[in-house]
């Protein structure tokens, strides 16, 4: 394995869940950017947002992306907003293959509506906020090498499909 498998998409799309499953199934290192930031900061994402702000979080995210990009190839679960920074997108594309886990607004809402650990959704109309974020970010997610529809698929199905795409890409375009 020469490049990272980079999972991109909205919060709630299943990046961490699919990444962990694939990591275990294929014995490949797993990097969860949000978890790495939380470990570095010794605080949860909502705590970081509340105490230090979004800009500070994005700076920490940028540093973690650099570290992971240069690490041993593995599976990388990005945060929903990781690609908002052009340098993150560039680094991740340079050192990995990007897979967009595309989930419908309805599926995302079903998964997220009762969560309290999503600071960007803490407002009067969280579903409206979620829809707005999806529309704003989708153009970035679509810069991925492959788009995989999540709705109606199990974690195992998604992992195997992703791995199949990965193997084909590595054989036909090793970069």
Swiss-Prot record:
Record's catalysed reaction(s): shikimate + ATP = 3-phosphoshikimate + ADP + H(+)
Enzyme class, first EC level, given as a word: transferase
GO biological process: amino acid biosynthetic process; aromatic amino acid family biosynthetic process; chorismate biosynthetic process
Swiss-Prot/TrEMBL keywords: Amino-acid biosynthesis, Aromatic amino acid biosynthesis, ATP-binding, Cytoplasm, Kinase, Magnesium, Metal-binding, Nucleotide-binding, Transferase
Binding site for substrate: 34, 58, 80, 137
Note describing how the cofactor binds: Binds 1 Mg(2+) ion per subunit.
Major subcellular site: cytoplasm
Gene Ontology CC entries for this record: cytosol
Residue sites binding Mg(2+) per the record: 16
Pfam families: SKI
A single MF term (Gene Ontology): shikimate kinase activity
General function of this protein: Catalyzes the specific phosphorylation of the 3-hydroxyl group of shikimic acid using ATP as a cosubstrate.
HAMAP family: Shikimate_kinase (MF_00109)
Subunit composition and interactions: Monomer.
Protein's UniProt name: Shikimate kinase
Organism of provenance: Methylacidiphilum infernorum (isolate V4) (Methylokorus infernorum (strain V4))
Name of encoding gene: aroK
